[in-house]
């Protein structure tokens, strides 16, 4: 990759800005594609050329990709809210179509696409999720996961046609610092700190550090096999464990009241409507409750063996995430 021109779409997002930070440490030439109205504060102080554009606008992509050797496509919509099917299809699926076309016409040597572990059909509990399971829009939970599954299948089809060298990376739940846009887990941390989080739902999720994902994407660009996909997972964390870790790092007691998942799911349906009305990001929805109850045994063995992917302890990631919010003056205090 040394000396290559690299383009990052979704550059102001959590993974995007951390990827650019890592590329900067390697003295790579980086161009960031950001939306016309995007706040570029996450890129402040970084060595990067900023280009305004939109993955739904093919011409803007072709302009942004001129002279590019490698494209990291991270732009997309991540949501746990319902009723967003059309915009998810337009941005997540249509965006991949446009990126693939622009890579062809611009002569991009390699495309690294960030999909999601949720795009992979979920096997029964007790079965480890790995790359042997297919990308299946009908075998995943929620409109977001379906859009990522369809987008991934579109890209794999483009690779099969020939003339496009693309690799797919599938992170689990991303945690860690530089969370400017406040991710779903970031919102949970802030709600815990403010005292807004009064209860919890038993379940589990796999978390991986954003810095390890950024490094994994670079490894995929360097070592990945064309048309192959790699899962980036870290550790399966039970919700009570997460609450205790937040208690340790933030200094306030964790909620002790456990809501049964069945009741929480019903409440989640109503919560989606409520949060939409007050224009606040939800702590939970019916979809997020389903995810916590789903299979979260995930293996990154392929990425570790073929790419050299490594991860740090999830507790360190939570600590760094909390401390970053604190250093930015974003962590609430209780009166």
Residue ranges and their predicted role:
Residues 4-26:
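N-terminal Rossmann NAD(P)H-binding glycine-rich loop of SDR-like oxidoreductase domains
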Residues 38-44, 48-94, 102:
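NAD(P)H-binding glycine-rich loop region in Rossmannoid oxidoreductase-like domains
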Residues 91-144:
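Conserved Rossmann-fold NAD(P)-dependent oxidoreductase catalytic core, especially the SDR/UDP-sugar
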Residues 98, 150, 183-184, 201-221, ...:
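Substrate-positioning beta->alpha
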Residues 136-139, 187-208, 212, 224:
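A conserved pocket-lining segment of Rossmann-fold NAD(P)-dependent short-chain dehydrogenase/reductase
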Residues 141-167:
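Active-site Tyr-X1-5-Lys
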Residues 162-164, 176-187, 220-230, 252-254:
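Glycine/proline-rich active-site loop of Rossmann-fold NAD(P)-dependent oxidoreductases
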Residues 216-283, 300, 315-335:
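Mid/C-terminal beta-alpha module of Rossmann-like enzyme folds, strongest
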């Amino acid at each position: 990759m040394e000396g290559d021109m690299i383009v990052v779409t979704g550059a102001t997002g959590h993974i995007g800005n951390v990827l650019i930070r890592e590329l900067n440490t390697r003295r790579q030439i980086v161009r960031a594609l950001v939306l016309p109205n995007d706040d570029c504060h996450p890129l402040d102080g970084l060595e990067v050329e900023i280009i305004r554009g939109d993955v739904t606008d093919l011409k803007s992509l072709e302009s942004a990709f001129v002279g590019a050797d490698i494209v990291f496509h991270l732009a997309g919509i991540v949501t746990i809210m319902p009723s967003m099917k059309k915009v998810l299809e337009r941005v997540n699926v249509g965006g991949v179509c446009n990126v693939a076309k622009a890579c062809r016409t611009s002569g991009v040597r390699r495309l690294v696409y960030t999909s999601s572990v949720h795009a992979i059909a979920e096997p029964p509990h007790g079965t480890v999720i790995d790359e042997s399971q297919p990308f299946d829009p009908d075998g995943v939970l929620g409109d977001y996961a379906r859009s990522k599954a369809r987008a991934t299948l579109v890209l794999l089809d483009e690779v099969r046609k020939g003339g496009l060298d693309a690799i797919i990376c599938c992170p689990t739940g991303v945690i860690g610092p530089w969370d400017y846009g406040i991710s779903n887990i970031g919102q949970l941390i802030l709600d815990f700190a403010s005292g807004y989080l009064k209860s919890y739902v038993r379940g589990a999720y796999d978390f991986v550090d954003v810095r390890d994902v950024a490094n994994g994407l670079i490894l995929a660009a360097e070592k990945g096999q064309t048309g192959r996909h790699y899962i980036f997972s870290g550790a399966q964390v039970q919700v009570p464990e997460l609450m205790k870790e937040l208690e340790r790092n933030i200094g306030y007691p964790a909620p002790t009241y456990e809501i049964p998942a069945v009741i929480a799911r019903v409440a989640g349906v109503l919560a989606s409507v409520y949060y939409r009305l007050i224009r606040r990001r939800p702590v939970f929805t019916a979809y997020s409750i389903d995810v916590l109850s789903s299979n979260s045994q995930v293996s990154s063995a392929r990425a570790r063996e073929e790419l050299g992917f490594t991860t740090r302890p999830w507790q360190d990631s939570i600590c760094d995430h909390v401390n970053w919010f604190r250093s930015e003056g974003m962590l609430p205090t209780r009166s």
